[in-house]
Swiss-Prot record:
Predominantly expressed in the root, with a strong expression in the cortex, endodermis, and stele. Water channel required to facilitate the transport of water across cell membrane. Plays an predominant role in root water uptake process in conditions of reduced transpiration, and in osmotic fluid transport. Its function is impaired by Hg(2+). Inhibited by cytosolic acidosis which occurs during anoxia in roots. InterPro entries: Aquaporin-like, Aquaporin_transptr, MIP, MIP_CS. This is Aquaporin PIP2-2. Residues 2-37, 96-123, 187-199, 269-285 are cytoplasmic. The keyword Ligase does not apply. A motif (NPA 2) lies at residues 226-228. The chain crosses the membrane at residues 38-58, 75-95, 124-144, 166-186, 200-220, 248-268. Residues 1-22 are annotated as: Disordered. It comes from Arabidopsis thaliana (Mouse-ear cress). It comes from the Eukaryota.
Length: 285
């Protein structure tokens, strides 16, 4: 909640109060159309995200495959793939933030749930919608690129040769921490009260965080940092290697999201202790 107050120089500034923590379990949400509208928005956004990004990955591999008429350094390269992921997140967060919050990622939803920004019901429904949207998005890629999809790996995440499990897990934890920490910072109530007149300020750093993490971790894991993205690609591609490594792309992002939530709420924000107390109180009701 924000309100105009008189600054020291006579200018109008915006004061704010932290919104109250979301109830842990809010059954009343199930009766509201706004919840289902948000769930649909998450489904469609994740579908579009996976469709564009996995199509970009496969297109790059086609263009750079010298055995199939491609050329060395052909296609968009790793830089272009990173831009595709970061750019789509920027676009989709901008489009859906006012409807669902623009999570498009179970790890983001999990972090916001731990910080009492969303209820358990909303978090679970979002995660289900995100995973289903991811499956459908990759399914469209396979349907439209059936001759290339399996040949070029289906955009599925797996641990690259030469890297051990610990390295891959660490890459996913740290990468997701960067993303979720950016989400918390970009959507901070104090920042929103001050910069609410610039609506792109939240989607832009979130998309840029996704871009930077992809540049760093594509060579290691193909960059997950989004369990729905990894799950959707693994389901449609359905080969042993992505499934063998699949746990990394759930455990790593969830650990990274939890650390980011704790760091932002209980280290950087004084209101964190209040959220923790209200979480315990709600759990005991």
């Amino acid at each position: 909640m924000a309100k105009d107050v008189e600054g020291p120089e006579g200018f109008q500034t915006r004061d704010y109060e932290d919104p109250p923590p979301t109830p842990f379990f809010d059954a009343d949400e199930l009766t509201k159309w706004s919840l289902y509208r948000a769930v649909i928005a998450e489904f469609v956004a994740t579908l579009l995200f996976l469709y564009i990004t996995v199509l970009t990955v496969i297109g790059y591999k086609i263009q750079s495959d010298t055995k199939a008429g491609g050329v060395d350094c052909g296609g968009v390269g790793i830089l272009g793939i990173a831009w595709a992921f970061g750019g789509m997140i920027f676009i989709l967060v901008y489009c859906t933030a006012g409807i669902s919050g623009g999570h498009i990622n179970p790890a983001v939803t999990f972090g916001l749930f731990l910080a009492r920004k969303v209820s358990l019901i909303r978090a679970v429904l979002y995660m289900v919608a995100q995973c289903l949207g991811a499956i459908c998005g990759v399914g469209f890629v396979k349907a439209f690129q059936s001759s290339y999809y399996d040949r070029y790996g289906g955009g599925a995440n797996s641990l690259a040769d030469g890297y051990n499990t610990g390295t891959g897990l660490a890459a996913e934890i740290i990468g997701t921490f960067v993303l979720v920490y950016t989400v918390f910072s970009a959507t901070d109530p104090k920042r929103n009260a001050r910069d609410s007149h610039v609506p792109v300020l939240a989607p832009l750093p979130i998309g840029f965080a996704v871009f930077m993490v992809h540049l760093a971790t594509i060579p290691i894991t193909g960059t997950g940092i989004n369990p729905a993205r990894s799950f959707g690609a693994a389901v449609i591609y359905n080969k042993s290697k992505p499934w063998d490594d699949h746990w990394i792309f759930w455990v790593g992002p969830f650990i990274g999201a939890a650390i980011a939530a704790f760091y932002h709420q209980f280290v950087l924000r004084a209101s964190g202790s209040k959220s923790l107390g209200s979480f315990r109180s709600a759990a005991n009701v």
